[in-house]
Swiss-Prot record:
Gene Ontology molecular function, alphabetical: ATP binding; ATP-dependent diacylglycerol kinase activity; zinc ion binding
Pfam families reported for this sequence: C1_1, DAGK_acc, DAGK_cat, DGKD_4H, PH
Induction (record text): By glucocorticoids.
Protein name according to UniProt: Diacylglycerol kinase eta
Amino acid sequence: MAGAGYQHHPPGGAAVGTSAVSPTAAGPGEDSSDSEAEQGGPQKLIRKVSTSGQIRTKTSIKEGQLLKQTSSFQRWKKRYFKLRGRTLYYAKDSKSLIFDEVDLSDASVAEASTKNANNSFTIITPFRRLMLCAENRKEMEDWISSLKSVQSREPYEVAQFNVEHFSGMHNWYACSHARPTFCNVCRESLSGVTSHGLSCEVCKFKAHKRCAVRATNNCKWTTLASIGKDIIEDEDGVAMPHQWLEGNLPVSAKCAVCDKTCGSVLRLQDWKCLWCKAMVHTACKDLYHPVCPLGQCKVSIIPPIALNSTDSDGFCRATFSFCVSPLLVFVNSKSGDNQGVKFLRRFKQLLNPAQVFDLMNGGPHLGLRLFQKFDNFRILVCGGDGSVGWVLSEIDKLNLNKQCQLGVLPLGTGNDLARVLGWGGSYDDDTQLPQILEKLERASTKMLDRWSIMTYELKLPAKASLLPEPPEASGGFYMTIYEDSVANHLTKILNSDEHAVVISSAKILCETVKDFVAKVEKAQDKTLENTVVAEAVANKCSVLNEKLEQLLQALHADAQASRVPPGVGPAIPEEDAVESSSEESLGESKDQLVNDIAKPSSQKAVKPREIMLRANSLKKAVRQVIEEAGKVMDEQTVQPCEPVSPSCDYDSPEADDSKDNDTKESPAAKSTSQAPEAQAIRGHFQTDSVAGSAMATTKENLPVLNTRIICPGLRAGLAASIAGSSIINKMLLANIDPFGATPFIDPDLDSLDGYSEKCVMNNYFGIGLDAKISLEFNNKREEHPEKCRSRTKNLMWYGVLGTRELLQRSYKNLEQRVQLECDGQYIPLPSLQGIAVLNIPSYAGGTNFWGGTKEDDIFAAPSFDDKILEVVAVFDSVQMAVSRVIKLQHHRIAQCRTVKITIFGDEGVPVQVDGEAWVQPPGIIKIVHKNRAQMLTRDRAFESTLKSWEDKQKCDSGKPVLRTNLYIHPAADLATEEVSQMRLCSQAAEELITRICDAATIHCLLGAGTGSSVNACSHALNKANPRFPESLTRDTATEIAINVKALYNETESLLVGRVPLQLESPHEERVSSALHSVEVELQKLTEIPWLYYILRPNEDEEPPMDCTKRNSKSTVFRIVPKFKMEKAQKQKTSSQPGPGDTESGSYEANSPGN
């Protein structure tokens, strides 16, 4: 920065009196009030320039475009910068002949402000300051790292860790302070009322801007090498010492030794540990315990002494004995209006800076590579749903699914996954992060289903509409009645056990079909000029008659094998029609059916599978005739169009005939209804008859598909008309084929040949209306990021875009452009604008779009760990808005395990996955299960019980129990009996771990469900095993007891929880026996006074009146397992369970997400 004597600046030169402010907004709190005092008198700055030829001879470390703040009204202009040696050069562009140069010998670099929304930073030299602005935060971090490497004379590598993590250099940023603050370099107060200056984002080291270059490199330790001579060595190895920082203590600071007030607002005095946050007087410092306990977050911290070596790839290798369950933190610095920057700094202050990473600076790969050698670790992602998906995808690439559990801290806009896992919809207070880390330590683990979005791009002809236009609906209205009648009576024939109902429905069905054919023939006579359409209609009517005759023959064969009381109506009189031969055969078949039903017979009954196939064939034939009839009615009012599109046959393929070796349909009819290109498309989508029959035979031995859908026999118009009524409940599952052989079942459902994985879905998938709104919002955010920097603004934009779609109705006929299949079964769609596929019960920012969380008579309760998807319809934006306050259910479509969506036409359709939207070209989209991820869910029941116990302890002792005090004094030794009991408990736990590992080789779910508990318990046991019992202290014994108890609860919940895990016979007895042994030993441990309240809360003694009320029926720490109670009840039916045995033994059932 120029002094007062500097009178001239060239265009684009350094600014006079510029301050560290944002280029978009500068508040008074961001201005540097000590700018003039820092110079120590006027100094004349001589401008130094170099030619491009002189610069070319030096090696370039980094170069590129940056914005530079100028002297005229603090405007920003683009300049080209080159860092070569310890000099920074800049000019208007890279081809300029003259470059200004800045000497970096005594320079320091600092971020411009606290939130730093515009990625600006300042280069501070004794003579000038350069305010620069990068395009994104990663580029800013790269420039700062390269400038620091020049100062430290260390090689700069972007691909590895930032050098400041290991060099001890401070990471400066400009900020103001609310109270008097002192410089840690010159010990003088920071200038101005707001004490504006530089602060290290990791260790809170304070400095004037002029003093920053003279600050010692004593930032927070990261590795064993950074500790240096302060390391503590004893007979057990190395120990973690305190790392003290002098002065600037809070007003309420008290000495941990003498319990007196320490610190001062008048001078720099007294000390604070950067790890355990203990504060001491200078005189008391030597009296304090030298070993640092790491404080409140010790479980999550990787101690610097643990990072003591590097592997062949250059990554640090951790010593596992120091880390039970370390925490890896990923922060998206852009999330929450750049609130991520504040959380990034706060986590570096609480944890080891080497375990905190910015997703915007290198992504998650670097952190996962550092932690991949750990047997068990936790991950905390601070950001939105997109950040979580990014980290999970990288976990898949490194194959770390079994080693890590992932938690979410919501900083984004939607945060649907965080809501479901119990972490809330938003989080803005960085001062509460220690409490968040505590809750994360007490969280339970649940499995999250993850789904692959497989795409196959293929241009398909436009899908023919099954519904005539409303103006021409006079004839179509009657045809709709016909089809509804056929579907209704077919359902009665298939489901009714009363023969009188079957006879009546068969009679009405015959009359309806004959009348329907006659109506179609009359409509056909009016369009004889279009021979192609007329021939198609005639062929379809012929096929319809054949299908009805086949159904009657199947019923006739079934009637010969059953006894039914007589009571038959009169024969149906024949009617004149064009197909007279077919009419006569139908009448004869019907009369024969009526007569045969009344005759007793002892022959074996025909399989109902054949009747089911004939009924489905008849329904398809009716639908095909309606398609052709709809085109005929279009010909009456609209000008003649092209021949019938063959793509309509795709909706109802004739696969059932090939499966039953039924060749009654004439080849001429098929050749007429299918063009060569349609046959090619059909061949691409379905297998041939041989493959179909083979697949059908294999599916006959499989259990019934767990697919719950709306009746596939319903037309789109019928489904739309009764969408909100109770008829859906009655028709649900009506026509699902229990033999797995309906013609709608895809015989090659699991084949993904030719498909590519577009992305992975964790939350939800949307196509149509909601995806269009998300796509427009994402485009708006990319064009104007300053308008979308807060959740409130984002919600307002969603409202504006949704209102616009309410008027435009861009996808009002989406059912005509897409086709939906659930578990291979075709789903007729009502009139809708979008389809949503849900994996979690939270959609678009907290909406329960499924409309409930409980099981009913039709659908199962939605869950994100059942490998089942929920499919719902999106009718309009009003429905999406109303569903935020009202639980709507009329738009439910299905629950299934796979979803297939076919996009027809030439134009793409908007698609979104977890809020990320794009335009998907025509083709096929398949949603199939990929894998499962371990997610950390907040366990409020356990937190409540633990808080009640802590309150009870406070009431008994009369003062709060500080967690850090447990580690200040040496742990007490155990008595002989206590050592013996701990030995037996450890042996029982080791036996249980062995049995679980043996069973997990066959039952993967057992290993996934207990993996974290097994690892934690093994680490706790290994601490005491090398020198047992000498190495056993109360702290170690307490840790062992807690981990053994957690393993017991986890295993019990899997064996006897809401969905018990079925093990094979030998493994089940072994695991149960080992679990019972652990239960007995845990009961013995409750006799030890200092372990009683940890393993079993006191339910008999009520707390004093001034204490928080405890839940006396809490079963979080209940020892007796549920399966033991059930076994005792079977043996002694007269015994009654106790009041504490009426609840489930698994506290996970009360956790969010269930």
